Curated annotation (Swiss-Prot):
SMART domains, A to Z: WRKY
Name of the molecule in the record: Disease resistance protein RRS1
Domain of life: Eukaryota
Chain ranges for the short sequence motif Nuclear localization signal as given in the UniProt record: 988-1005
Amino acid sequence: MTNCEKDEEFVCISCVEEVRYSFVSHLSEALRRKGINNVVVGVDSDDLLFKESQAKIEKAGVSVMVLPGNCDPSDVWLDKFAKVLECQRNNKDQAVVPVLYGDSLLRDQWLSELDFKGLSRIHQSRKECSDSILVEEIVRDVYETHFYVGRIGIYSKLLEIENMVNKQPIGIRCVGIWGMPGIGKTTLAKAVFDQMSSAFDASCFIEDYDKSIHEKGLYCLLEEQLLPGNDATIMKLSSLRDRLNSKRVLVVLDDVRNALVGESFLEGFDWLGPGSLIIITSRDKQVFCLCGINQIYEVQGLNEKEARQLFLLSASIKEDMGEQNLQELSVRVINYANGNPLAINVYGRELKGKKKLSEMETAFLKLKRRPPFKIVDAFKSTYDTLSDNEKNIFLDIACFFQGENVNYVIQLLEGCGFFPHVEIDVLVDKCLVTISENRVWLHKLTQDIGREIINGETVQIERRRRLWEPWSIKYLLEYNEHKANGEPKTTFKRAQGSEEIEGLFLDTSNLRFDLQPSAFKNMLNLRLLKIYCSNPEVHPVINFPTGSLHSLPNELRLLHWENYPLKSLPQNFDPRHLVEINMPYSQLQKLWGGTKNLEMLRTIRLCHSHHLVDIDDLLKAENLEVIDLQGCTRLQNFPAAGRLLRLRDVNLSGCIKIKSVLEIPPNIEKLHLQGTGILALPVSTVKPNHRELVNFLTEIPGLSEASKLERLTSLLESNSSCQDLGKLICLELKDCSCLQSLPNMANLDLNVLDLSGCSSLNSIQGFPRFLKQLYLGGTAIREVPQLPQSLEILNAHGSCLRSLPNMANLEFLKVLDLSGCSELETIQGFPRNLKELYFAGTTLREVPQLPLSLEVLNAHGSDSEKLPMHYKFNNFFDLSQQVVNDFFLKTLTYVKHIPRGYTQELINKAPTFSFSAPSHTNQNATFDLQPGSSVMTRLNHSWRNTLVGFGMLVEVAFPEDYCDATDFGISCVCRWSNKEGRSCRIERNFHCWAPGKVVPKVRKDHTFVFSDVNMRPSTGEGNDPDIWAGLVVFEFFPINQQTKCLNDRFTVTRCGVRVINVATGNTSLENISLVLSLDPVEVSGYEVLRVSYDDLQEMDKVLFLYIASLFNDEDVDFVAPLIAGIDLDVSSGLKVLADVSLISVSSNGEIVMHSLQRQMGKEILHGQSMLLSDCESSMTENLSDVPKKEKKHRESKVKKVVSIPAIDEGDLWTWRKYGQKDILGSRFPRGYYRCAYKFTHGCKATKQVQRSETDSNMLAITYLSEHNHPRPTKRKALADSTRSTSSSICSAITTSASSRVFQNKDEPNKPHLPSSSTPPGNAAVLFKMTDMEEFQDNMEVDNDVVDTRTLALFPEFQHQPEEEYPWSTFFDY
């Protein structure tokens, strides 16, 4: 990993030797789990802190100082800490986190002597909280105050990358991370690397890949990164391949800019081992294409909440600062950066330290005008890779075409001699330009940097290639002749532009000046000229005082001049290169005198030029496509345009003096004639390829020939023309307020009939037989004739309908909109395939049974309160609370379309259901919603084979000013771990209102209910879903129509999940217990198991720990009698553990645990031992204070001490070993046993066993107390039976246990107590380990200290009353 250990990601922990391997080791490990891997621990030994670690402390981003509690005020440690504090004050980027560990009476004294000014927090150990809580507090402080800045917004992106990786087939998987400069590609790649690298055999993170491979070469780079520590240099790439073809390798190539360089590395990456992962980050999409990477993740910017967090942290602004202006400034900065983390961080740091708001305002304005070098350098490095044409197109877009229609931009740039189709794609691939909703967009930073490139070319305004700043342009164009004190005119010479200028866009909103006649004389290469007013409320005042314009550049492609003040363009202007003339509201009477060459002209817009009288000059524009003369009230004639074969759009609306049109081009698509004096069109007007006529005509003969005519709008009288409609497909008579009736149209082939807004229309004789869409909104029709069976959409919104015919036979009807039909009284029935029903604002009191196919119901303002059960409801805004509650409960309690016995195929086809209602209407309903935007649920084991899907309840808080919820939706992410421990996920998007429908203003918070049978984990063996421990996590995110996450103004406040399974009785929907709410966290296999363990009863926890450490892979019949001997219920306990996936029992009766389950058991044991270790010192002190009399009383319990040979069979009593320790001064450890009938009979007998110092073949046994029960006569039989159950296993166990039980790893040759002192069958099994060496590492104890880890394994010993056990015997030496 090259150059990865940045100073700002480096943590130094300084401590004393006493806490290095206890508290500090836990702290460093917790930091690593949080993703902070660069942690260095320095120990104060021989002044090492300042001799060797001082440089590291000064370079570290965070310095954690762990001060011991027993510090004396004169201690050198305090002097060192004071110096570290001073170092921190000199280095503002470094954070110091002091930790006062341990109790001390002197603490208050020396605390007062230290100056903690500037430190955000001091952490102290307290009696009332454990070390684990203290560690958690420190880690949170370190992460949130220093490291969190770089990881804001990373979590959700990590999930998407993980999902992208998991979807790829097993083999060599590749992912590309793509995004604009500063968007967080490297940060995201590092986060992925930190999270995944431990799962690979080899891994490397190569920063600045192009530079690294140029400096070191391919072989050296590969050898250094993938095989560190090699002595021999790899001379051939084939040798490297041979060494890595069996390894799972993670390779991250960061910031690959040269596609060929990346391809040279990856073209043969098939030599990596299966399961390898290659991640490439680049700002150029072509890199991924050439490298053969198809899975590309585009990094999005931070959302509003994340951006605010980052800015406040970077600028050190507190969240609760009350000054409104300061908050407004932060919003402006965040909006300007538009989610770019680099910009937000840089601007935040630039504003940091500014005390006055005015200073911050000024600094921000300067930054906008001149972006910081770090940002400019990041963007300009991409700009420098462009070709000359690509640079010109980028600069044109940055200066002039932000947000313009992409086809419009392409048309203009093509006229300039570029190849924009290809070159704009290059800009998109390099993240300089984006295309959204068919418009060209640049990030605000990109636009400003592009403009800065232009301004940086020269300080002379007249020599800049592109001009857009109004005051600079005014300086060049303003008329400069003035009278001085009534004297003759004096001329003030000014620069008047130069041939370098290629584009000039002047916004005249705030300007008032006179243009000089020769303003454009020197701009010989001007391609783009636009003079406009961005504020429609301002009337610009820019005139020619001399009444003339001498010239315009002949290289113009765009001439856009609003309110042009002259009667014509200069006569010497040659428009042969013009692509567009756009001169609305001009004073033009004609364009020019005579005929000009207009071979490049595509568009001419002279709308509202009230003085225009003649446009005959356009006949030479053979490539003309659009003519817009709307509002030219003096224009009397439209020329014959039959030769303009490319003309497709003509707008003559408002040209009241035009009485006729002689000829219409054959390829016309749109003809707008509203407000003209035209009463009729010639027969030649209507052609077979006409697609739309928009007019106010009274007669259109020859329509029968219009086989492709689709639309005819605003026809005033239909009687005379219906017979000529021929093969008309769509007839629009919208807003024909004079139309009163329509004849029988049964013989027409109409598919669409739109009568919306025909307020006088009160009768229809008959409908076309193939009609599919009928719009009657706003009509006066009270009754309609029989509807055609082909009908798919009926919209009668706001009509006067009182009744409808029976629609049960309309099997194709999908949408029925009766909203606002205030006079509608009854509905006889609904079609069986109806999907959307709207009757908001009706007076219906009762609605017939709704079909099962229904998906959307809008009942806003409806008086109906008797709606039947169905699947998808929306917009219950004003129904009563009781009705809404009934709907919630019905939806969550009955799913009648999934009856018992349904096949999986039919279940997969089952429809979804959903509905919503204002949250205030269901306040009294019981839905078990949890706070937060995510929830973890557990599947009952009995439900898993019948699982169909989930019902999800989500409560969303909308902002008060939210007006239109049409595009609002909710994304649900379902995550679980499969039985192999791998993370899995499913994501579904639910849009809460049907697209295209008008949604009332959302005024209240809403509760949404969704169900989808596809939200179901994959099936494992049989029909059992492949879910580990039955735990599933659901997360909910507000989204828009484009499935992009909305900002934090939309908040998921509560959520819940219910299970839907195949019906087992009268209902098929069961409640499920909500385990916990998390917001949000990543659920690993370990966390799933730990939640299952924490929910167990105490005895089941003990059973799990026994099995995890002793009985893995053993037969149930073998384990059962042994566990029963310690008073545990084996049969029920094993079933409980199996139900929550903590163990599994194989078909041949073996208890099986996965490695993760065993690991968790060991960690739990280790954690309990750490907790107990805190009690040892206090226990020792307490025992040392025990009165001698009490100690003698305990010693008097010793009944006898005997010596027997080590090979002796024993005393035939049943004993259980519960501890062992090394004894100072002795070669042999001592074992501690208690009677096996302690719990069943209350027996207090114990014994201690140790080898003799003089004869190692003899055992010294000390018996304490007596048994209170007869000697068991069946013990040997029981042991024999257990041995016969698995004789081979038992013999192997006995051999292992006899020589290795609790062997101290520091003394491998030291003989230990044999297990024969305990009954062979029981003892052998009791101390059999799956991995004895690993267990010994976790269970080792210091000399003369109780083996508390063993005590943790047997918790019943921890709670034994004091009089039942001679504690003093542990401290005899």
